[in-house]
Amino acid sequence: MKKASELIFIPIPGIGHIVSTVEIAKLLLCRDDNLFITILIMKFPFTADGSDVYIKSLAVDPSLKTQRIRFVNLPQEHFQGTGATGFFTFIDSHKSHVKDAVTRLMETKSETTRIAGFVIDMFCTGMIDLANEFGLPSYVFYTSGAADLGLMFHLQALRDEENKDCTEFKDSDAELVVSSFVNPLPAARVLPSVVFEKEGGNFFLNFAKRYRETKGILVNTFLELEPHAIQSLSSDGKILPVYPVGPILNVKSEGNQVSSEKSKQKSDILEWLDDQPPSSVVFLCFGSMGCFGEDQVKEIAHALEQGGIRFLWSLRQPSKEKIGFPSDYTDYKAVLPEGFLDRTTDLGKVIGWAPQLAILAHPAVGGFVSHCGWNSTLESIWYGVPIATWPFYAEQQVNAFELVKELKLAVEIDMGYRKDSGVIVSRENIEKGIKEVMEQESELRKRVKEMSQMSRKALEEDGSSYSSLGRFLDQIQTS
């Protein structure tokens, strides 16, 4: 009798990465009745981000093969340090807990089940050491795009093979020729900020170095979206197998992630959208960490009022703690221009938390001012909503560059904006970007609608991502 296989997934904490992990687990379980999955859950020690509510909701999710998936909560660790280095160290501090959890799993597994390997988040490469200790293969789940993955490999090779100090790119006018991009990359403008830090940059590039030790990389993208980047990775003899398996999205059960209070907020928002004409509303939302200072908030408000376009604006206040998530305002008037809410009462709606998927799916929404996180990008493409790019941190500037210059699926508000730069984006630039993204008969809108159809076909039987996922399943059976 053929043995069942079990995969151990290790995502980083944060709702975006956990949701993506569960969604790819669902796809795998639906494709192989002889597969079991365990997901090890790390938690941030500060403000909750909805992960607990989401995981509890999975018990009643009809699309989940609950008898073949389980969640193991790891003991909570303290977050010491700040910035990227503090975050990476926090992830690595869970190694002993992961080792204990896997040891218990191996002691209790039945003789008819074999552990087929670790599937680690893109920032969990320290867990490769544990996989090696247990004699198990490891795979990477890369939750960003293929072009960004190619950039990581490129920068790592510059450091390790050409002895290049990547921090020198910070104030340079260098343009990088990277095989996963068609156009040269303006380094100072779009490289992830962490690359410009000596310690954090080395941490970051070591991830790519360690990817090369694994058996393959699952990438949350699809062939039709990034054909050049995927081809460049596939033809590079130094890079292990890459499996484009996206878009990995939680499009069917977003409502399960929210409390009853947020469910009421969601209903109010959707009722307001129901009263708006088709494709007439621009949606502004900047992700789970997205927030601005008062000066920038006022520039956005002036742009919206002057532009006269219907808007739905997710406006959140910065955390009062050094490390933490943005929260909802108790009074928007404290930060908005005087009289703004009264003057725009028939034009738009200001909200706090936003049910992003439900909003993007609504026919009234015609454009999305976005931080260009990869999940948000894929969601916008899935629903055929053009993007105006306003990145904050991490790989978001790279994503914005790819969307605007490479894929022609977005317009620019400020592609090189960085959250901690102190730069204020002008109301004129904001208004211009919003008007461009909201053009009804534009070539951009046509391209995004076409890509939306391709994103859905990729996951259908015999679609590009469906086939790629099948190749991965074949790989774990033979490893």
Swiss-Prot record:
Residues binding UDP-alpha-D-glucose: 143, 354, 356, 371, 374-376, 379, 395-396
Influence of pH: Optimum pH is 7.5-8.
Glycosyltransferase recorded as keyword: yes
Name this protein carries in UniProt: UDP-glucose flavonoid 3-O-glucosyltransferase 6
Tissue occurrence: Strongly expressed in achenes, with lower expression levels detected in receptacles.
Enzyme class: transferase
Organism for this UniProt entry: Fragaria ananassa (Strawberry)
Activity's thermal dependence: Optimum temperature is 35 degrees Celsius.
